[in-house]
Curated annotation (Swiss-Prot):
EC annotation from Swiss-Prot or TrEMBL: 2.4.1.21
Enzyme class: transferase
Residues holding ADP-alpha-D-glucose: 153
Top-level taxon in the UniProt lineage: Eukaryota
Protein name: Starch synthase 1, chloroplastic/amyloplastic
GO molecular function (one): alpha-1,4-glucan glucosyltransferase (ADP-glucose donor) activity
Composition skew (Pro residues), residue ranges: 66-91
Gene Ontology biological process: starch biosynthetic process
Cellular component, GO annotation: amyloplast; chloroplast
Pathway: Glycan biosynthesis; starch biosynthesis
Annotated region (Disordered), positions in chain: 66-95
Keywords on record: Amyloplast, Chloroplast, Glycosyltransferase, Plastid, Starch biosynthesis, Transferase, Transit peptide
Length: 647
């Protein structure tokens, strides 16, 4: 029999209290106190400011003891002369009395046994990783995400959630990743090794009780857990199709968040559940309901009081905003509406009677998460400004004390010029001869004149306004007057796709535009080009500049977000000699971009030793995930120093 309601694991503390007769006198009054505390919280949450989160308890403040419903009071002690009684089974009836907003139809005995075992044993199934540096403190870490490579990926979020958990597991942590099991025919093979766990739960939300099941694969020392529901089985991309975003995305990712909260309590992975002492790492709006659920539906009943949550913002532009009328569908207590409340500015409202009221998933996590991380230090500052905060800048500014930035890493198993299977020739920082050969092969593949002396500039990315394609379009006529070659790879706005095709016909010996995307081609362009151009208007982190430096390709970028953090402008007169790994220009104008490109091209032609120094400094930078994982460990430890979020 499987758990059939959210919070199935919340009875674990009560099970342990059966052995403590001293609590019997208090147990009968706990339900009344719970109702009184809910009234007090309701009054407090109603005053929650739209500009900032509720005040947190002082660090020395201790949480109230777990609430124990009267019907779970421990039985009277047995007479001394009689043998020790066996533990009575938990009652199936009356569990719903825990709280009006917490529905349980029954608890499986095997789930309860698993929770008891986890209370005394938190060892993970992590394999030996002697070659990796180990963390001083190891924890149980639960990633919650809408995508993770290689199972499902639509962008950088998938890369991060497919690599960072592996890096943390290699450092000794027990790591679980919870994500949807997307099935649309072509992706079915991605989950071929994931096995059905025989565990399922029923989630009360959106006007009904929705059953989800769990699949599991153990790979690279990580427990990959896939939440299965019919809403994840449809054609199209992960979040939408040709007609736009799916209309039920709020429902789909509400299910994911509930399931992620239950998975550590009910899934026996490697023989043990993860238990209640976890670090939840929630990624973007898809997982942002998790910290709210922990604070609203678990901690008030003694569950997950030893757990913490970290929100990772990969792109603040996507916040999961839906009409305010959908809040009751989320299954949260009414008094928690303030945590998710969102009001659109007047200019964004559709008509005069539109009040602009909405719920914002990401805001809920910003309010309730214990720590907040952006994917670069520069982006952590930008999100607190009116220009980059996407409406959440004041709230994020109020949480500066728990806001940090960590630059993403790259998978050096996939991105390594010494072993890359996509390259015709290999090279290293000690022997760069293979890079010139890769350039010649790329020129042949593209039908460009094979010339070692001409600078070859590349662009890889989406063809849209955010990536600065309009600036490239305006700069190309002037840039093509130079002795230069330019190659672009990407897809996106049909207008820019058509422009790429027409520009190629206008500059047949200088310009090539590849509409679409190909992983092998992106590797060959990264290795074969001399310069990589990234004029993004905003870039939370950016990975292409990291790939470029790893391959000895010099980046020319707009100085924003993670680009500013990772690319150091060339300085021939540094304190220790020549410094820098590329050029970061600002402000974002065509003239500034052309100046940076011409400076780079001049250095390439006239100062070969300096150019080689630029290449080697970029190749020796530590872009590994292990470096990023070490910084995440510090964030986790800071989170556990403070008390968890409570109302």
């Amino acid at each position: 029999m499987a758990a059939t309601g959210v919070g199935a694991g919340c009875l674990a503390p009560s099970v342990r209290l059966r052995a403590d007769p001293a609590t019997a006198a208090r147990a009968s009054a706990c339900v009344v106190r719970a109702r009184l505390r809910r009234v007090a919280r309701g009054r407090y949450v109603a005053e929650l400011s739209r500009e900032g989160p509720a005040a947190r308890p002082a660090q020395q403040q201790q949480l109230a003891p777990p609430l124990v419903p009267g019907f779970l009071a421990p039985p009277p002690p047995a007479p001394a002369q009689s043998p020790a009684p066996t533990q009575p089974p938990l009652p199936d009836a009356g569990v719903g009395e825990l709280a009006p907003d917490l529905l349980l139809e029954g608890i499986a005995e095997d789930s309860i046994d698993s929770i008891i075992v986890a209370a005394s044993e938190q060892d993970s199934e992590i394999m030996d990783a002697k070659d990796q540096p180990q963390a001083k403190v190891t924890r149980s870490i639960v990633f919650v995400t809408g995508e993770a490579a290689p199972y499902a990926k639509s962008g950088g979020l998938g890369d991060v959630c497919g690599s960072l958990p592996i890096a943390l597991a290699a450092r000794g942590h027990r790591v679980m990743v919870v994500m949807p099991r997307y099935l649309n025919g072509s992706s079915d093979k991605n989950y071929a090794k994931a096995l059905y766990t025989a565990k399922h739960i029923k989630i009360p939300c959106f006007g009904g009780s929705h059953e989800v099941t769990f699949f599991h694969e153990y790979r690279d020392n990580v427990d990959w857990v896939f939440v299965d529901h019919p809403s994840y089985h449809r054609p199209g991309s992960l979040y939408g199709d040709n007609f736009g975003a799916f209309g039920d995305n709020q429902f789909r990712y509400t299910l994911l968040c509930y399931a992620a909260c239950e998975a550590p309590l009910i899934l026996e992975l490697g023989g043990y559940i993860y238990g209640q002492n976890c670090m939840f790492v929630v990624n973007d709006w898809h997982a942002s309901l998790v910290p709210v659920l922990l604070a609203a539906k678990y901690r008030p009943y003694g569950v997950y009081r030893d757990s913490r949550s970290t929100l990772v913002i990969h792109n603040l532009a996507h916040q999961g905003v839906e009409p305010a009328s959908t809040y009751p569908d989320l299954g949260l207590p009414p008094e928690w509406y303030g945590a998710l409340e969102w009001v659109f500015p007047e200019w964004a409202r559709r008509h005069a009677l539109d009040k602009g009221e909405a719920v914002n998933f990401l805001k809920g996590a910003v309010v309730t998460a214990d720590r907040i991380v952006t994917v670069s230090q520069g982006y952590s500052w930008e999100v607190t400004t009116a220009e980059g905060g996407q409406g959440l800048n004041e709230l994020l500014s109020s949480r500066k004390s728990v806001l940090n930035g960590i630059v993403n890493g790259i998978d050096i198993n996939d991105w390594n010029p010494t072993t890359d299977k996509c390259l015709p020739h290999h090279y290293s920082v000690d022997d760069l001869s293979g890079k010139a050969k890769c350039k010649a092969e790329l020129q042949k593949e593209l039908g460009l004149p094979v010339r070692e002396d001409v600078p070859l500039i590349g662009f890889i990315g989406r063809l849209d306004y955010q990536k600065g394609i309009d600036l490239i379009k305006m700069a190309i006529p002037e840039l093509m007057r130079e002795d230069v070659q330019f190659v672009m790879l990407g897809s996106g706005d049909p207008i820019f796709e058509g422009w790429m095709r027409s520009t190629e016909s206008s500059y047949k010996d200088k310009f090539r535009g590849w509409v679409g995307f190909s992983v092998p081609v992106s590797h060959r362009i990264t290795a074969g080009c001399d310069i990589l151009l990234m004029p993004s208007r905003f870039e939370p982190c950016g990975l292409n500049q990291l790939y470029a430096m790893q391959y000895g390709t010099v980046p020319v970028v707009h100085g924003t977000g993670g680009l500013r953090d990772t690319v150091e402008t060339f300085n021939p007169f540094g304190a220790k000699g020549e410094e820098g790994t590329g050029w970061a220009f600002s402000p974002l104008t065509v003239d500034k971009m052309l100046w940076a490109l011409r400076t780079a091209m001049s250095t390439f032609r006239e100062h070969k030793p300096s150019w080689e120094g630029l290449m080697k400094r970029g190749m020796t930078k530590d872009h590994t995930w292990d470096h990023a994982a070490e910084q995440y460990e510090q964030i986790f430890e800071w989170a556990f120093v403070d008390q968890p979020y409570v109302m």
